[in-house]
Amino acid sequence: SIGGNSHTDLHIYHCDNSLFLNLLEKNRSAYDYYIIMPHFKTEQMKHVSYTEEAVRAINKIPKDKLVIMDNNRIAIEDPFIEIFQDFENDIYGALQEGLSKIKKYSKLFLVYPENSVYPYPRRILYGFRKFCTEFALDYDILEEIYDDIILKKGDLFITIEESDLVNLVTQIREKEFSLGGDIGVISYNDTPLKELLGITCISTDFKKMGETAARMILDKSKGKVKNPFNFIDRDSL
């Protein structure tokens, strides 16, 4: 951590470009460091890494005060602190780690919400397709877990949103399939509750991301650091 003498404020902009710009302008000279996780959405609720206005606003921040976390698809040339996820290759690599268990299933489904309040990078989708194609696995893309979804023995689902995970596990139990036997489930991004419930996850290490940012701030160092992304094997696969 940065230490007990530091003070941190959290401002949430809900992937909204206008709100982000207003927050940044309002707090232009308020802080020693600006830690930004750049994820934006279009009017059609699609994910974009940045907007031209956001890049211009971020570029006004002195680079020795700038920390970009999570998403590094932003056009800033001068060196600064950058801890990022490689969304496409992260999911590809994590699924490859679990390949021996994944191959026992007949078909893979990625539940990727096309229109979400907090949209997800499409690079997740690209990495999943790349994995399935390379290892000749049958797959499909779903927008959500519907209440009347048809489940078959041998299906493996990868969910991103919590609501889809809850709906899926509920239906697996109601239809008397065995979780991790008849039907597999992998969830994107780990939480303590998923650990408690034995849900297999593929996840970046958010704690490590924060620790790396704190260390680089204290060391006054700059540079790009890829954050670890892990396959966490539990009972649902």
Positions of predicted regions on the chain:
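Flexible loop/turn connectors
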Residues: L151-L237
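An alpha-beta-alpha
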Residues: F87-F131, V225-L237
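Hydrophobic/aromatic residues located in beta-strands of well-ordered beta-sheets
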Residues: L66-V67, L108, V185
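Short, conserved loop/helix-junction motifs that constitute active-site signature segments
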Residues: A57-K63, I102-K103, K175-G180
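Short beta-strand elements in bilobed, periplasmic/extracellular small-molecule ligand-binding domains
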Residues: I2-H14, L108-V111, F128-Y146, D155-L156
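Hydrophobic alpha-helical segments within soluble ligand-binding/sensing domains
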Residues: Y50-R56, D70-F109, S203-K222
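Short, polar loop motifs at secondary-structure junctions
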Residues: M69-I74, L142-Y146, E161-E162, I186-P192
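Alpha-helical recognition/docking segments in bacterial nutrient-uptake
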Residues: S1-N89, G93, L156-T159, S163
